[in-house]
């Protein structure tokens, strides 16, 4: 039977393993998020590589510890790289994370491409409530790439996506993790209302899940990354109330996280699965 204490122990072990191994994470991400994502990975103990050229994608994915694919600003060439890298990851047992930014009928081309990427079986699908709910086949009104649905509503609509991935991670006021590996839904609390106001925090979270997936199971990877962000957000908010100072202190705590902080501040709850 899964317990919160056992899960937190596994998160601490995953964090320790990432510090020891410095996993190489290939990021095919959007132009808005690339710099911030790379800095978050470096601060967390991983090694980012923003390789999104289709002519280099296959060879680089083969040597990567993990792959992160984010559809925030896809171009035709970048989409080719995504398809090549996702296929290569599946064939070479490289864990990979799919972040279906903006999925829905308004952005139809990227949504079609996202559907095609699902055939390569991502380890984790990560998104906001609207993206995940729409990807699961529900009709949801979104505001651009921002969610208009609460995460506690979305997780109850997302179980069908577990046919495509081992784990589904939904970010929001509380975060929810659905998994084929755990007999409960995991709710992660913490963070700050300022986090969504900083460009690319969600995108960087997806890449951090990929980094953790190089050293642990998909479920613990998603949980570790969400706890990592939740603790950093909570502690940063205790020191800063404005966006500029919060952003800087948040990155500091991304870097300063350790086993003691995880044990002290990780706030998770187990919920019954309601398919």
Swiss-Prot record:
Superkingdom as given in the UniProt entry: Bacteria
GO MF entry, a single one: ATP binding
Gene3D superfamilies the UniProt entry points to: 3.40.1190.20
Metabolic or biological pathway: Cofactor biosynthesis; thiamine diphosphate biosynthesis; 4-methyl-5-(2-phosphoethyl)-thiazole from 5-(2-hydroxyethyl)-4-methylthiazole: step 1/1
Keyword entries, A-Z: ATP-binding, Kinase, Magnesium, Metal-binding, Nucleotide-binding, Thiamine biosynthesis, Transferase
Enzyme class: transferase
GO annotation terms (biological process): thiamine biosynthetic process; thiamine diphosphate biosynthetic process
Catalytic reaction list: 5-(2-hydroxyethyl)-4-methylthiazole + ATP = 4-methyl-5-(2-phosphooxyethyl)-thiazole + ADP + H(+)
Binding annotation for substrate: 50, 200
The keyword tRNA-binding appears for this protein: no
Keyword Kinase appears in the UniProt entry: yes
Amino-acid positions noted as binding ATP in the UniProt annotation, renumbered to this chain: 126, 171
EC number annotated for this UniProt entry: 2.7.1.50
CDD domains in UniProt: THZ_kinase (cd01170)
Required cofactor(s): Mg(2+)
UniProt cross-references to HAMAP family, sorted A to Z: Thz_kinase
NCBIfam families in the record: PRK09355.1
Assigned protein family: Belongs to the Thz kinase family.
Known role: Catalyzes the phosphorylation of the hydroxyl group of 4-methyl-5-beta-hydroxyethylthiazole (THZ).
Protein name: Hydroxyethylthiazole kinase
Species in which this protein is naturally found: Acinetobacter baumannii (strain ATCC 17978 / DSM 105126 / CIP 53.77 / LMG 1025 / NCDC KC755 / 5377)
Record lineage: Bacteria, Pseudomonadati, Pseudomonadota, Gammaproteobacteria, Moraxellales
Gene name of the record: thiM
């Amino acid at each position: 039977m899964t317990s919160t204490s056992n899960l937190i122990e596994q998160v601490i072990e995953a964090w320790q393993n990432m510090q020891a191994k410095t996993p190489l994470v290939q990021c095919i991400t959007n132009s808005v998020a690339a710099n911030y994502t790379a800095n978050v990975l470096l601060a967390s103990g991983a090694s980012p590589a923003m390789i999104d050229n289709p002519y280099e994608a296959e060879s680089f994915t083969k040597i990567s510890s993990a792959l992160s694919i984010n559809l925030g600003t896809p171009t035709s060439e970048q989409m080719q790289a995504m398809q090549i890298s996702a296929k290569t990851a599946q064939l070479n047992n490289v864990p990979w994370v799919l972040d279906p930014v903006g999925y829905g009928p308004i952005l139809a081309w990227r949504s079609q491409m996202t559907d095609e990427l699902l055939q390569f079986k991502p380890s984790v699908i990560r998104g906001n409530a609207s993206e995940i709910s729409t990807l699961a086949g529900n009709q949801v009104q979104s505001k651009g790439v921002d969610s208009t649905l609460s995460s506690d509503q979305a997780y109850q609509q997302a179980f069908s996506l577990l046919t495509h991935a081992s784990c589904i991670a939904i970010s929001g006021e509380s975060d929810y993790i659905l998994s084929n590996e755990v007999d409960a839904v995991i709710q992660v609390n913490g963070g700050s209302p300022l986090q969504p106001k900083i460009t690319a925090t969600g995108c960087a979270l997806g890449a951090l899940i990929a980094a953790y997936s190089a050293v642990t199971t998909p479920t613990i990877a998603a949980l570790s990354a969400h706890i990592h962000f939740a603790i950093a957000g909570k502690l940063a908010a205790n020191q800063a109330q404005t966006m500029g100072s919060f952003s800087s202190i948040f990155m500091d705590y991304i870097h300063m996280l350790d086993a003691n902080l995880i044990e002290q501040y990780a706030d998770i709850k187990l919920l019954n699965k309601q398919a």
